[in-house]
A protein has these predicted regions:
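Residues lining hydrophobic/aromatic ligand-binding pockets adjacent to catalytic sites
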Residues: 2-9, 22-257
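N-terminal low-complexity segments that are often proline-rich with Ser/Thr-Pro
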Residues: 10-14
Length: 257
């Protein structure tokens, strides 16, 4: 079957840009300062559900990502207490966040202090890591909300654990139930879910299912030539090198499949 591509200039508030004002939902596990594709999903929907009451993913992106250090991708990892795939994300606490964040903020300062939007970006990061949060889910959600506030993204962000009461359901059945509870008629999922989600299942409930695919983006880092550009880093990198206006332009560079 041929894939249908919907370019990002379509009105995503209405399925396929045709008529009506539908409600668009996105759902994703909480990641701390994730890459730009995560924020593209948030911006593309009316309501974004932080999927915090599902199993933790070991060696995933919930508590780690990459920033630019000396011209190369360098991974940061937030320490956790008792992280296990047998526990829910919302139940996993951060281990001594104050001490870790002090070192991390120093790394950010050393790595980005000459970036054009260092002041604005650093204030966001510092604000998030100073909040009195206990769990990695709370920390990640705070990061999403503060970044969206800075970028002027008005999408409503909620945690799945606070609303839906459907932990007896699994996989796409649970996602579908959230869409139904929200009376959504359009669900957008990250591109990585194409192999496990069934468009017909959603269509049977009169819900359009699309997958969001980020287009390649490039912006000026410290490097002077395009060949040394380091792509797909944490949103932290874009906050340092791009104005809010430019970053929003990059957020619109996607297609729906």
């Amino acid at each position: 079957m041929t894939k249908k591509i919907i370019e990002n200039d379509v009105n995503v508030s209405s399925p396929l840009g045709v008529g009506g004002g539908g409600r668009v939902i996105g759902i994703m596990q909480p990641y701390v300062f994730p890459y730009i594709g995560y924020f593209q999903l948030i911006k593309a929907v009316d309501k974004f559900v932080v999927y915090d009451d599902v199993a933790f993913i070991n060696k995933g992106w919930i508590n780690r990502n990459n920033i630019l250090v000396n011209g190369k991708a360098s991974m940061f990892t937030i320490p956790l207490v008792g992280a296990s795939q047998n526990r829910l994300i919302r139940d996993i606490e951060v281990d001594n966040l104050a001490a870790w964040s002090k070192k991390f903020l120093k790394t950010i300062e050393q790595s980005y202090k000459k970036a054009p939007f260092y002041k604005e970006g650093f204030e966001i990061i510092e604000q998030v890591f100073s909040l009195p949060v206990a769990s990695i889910a709370e920390l990640a959600t705070a990061g999403l909300k503060e970044t969206c506030k800075y970028l002027g993204i008005k999408t409503e962000i909620v945690e799945s654990s606070t609303i839906y009461n459907n932990q007896d359901l699994k996989s796409q059945g649970r996602i579908l139930d959230i869409c139904l509870q929200e009376k959504a008629n359009h669900y957008i999922n990250p591109i990585g879910g194409m192999a496990i989600y069934d468009k017909q299942l959603f269509a049977d409930s009169e819900i359009l299912l699309n997958f969001i695919k980020a287009k390649p983006i490039q912006y000026k880092q410290f490097n002077k030539d395009e060949a040394s550009f380091v792509p797909w880093l944490s949103i932290i990198d874009l906050l340092m090198f791009c104005s809010a206006e430019e970053l929003n332009e990059h957020l619109d560079k996607f297609e729906l499949v």
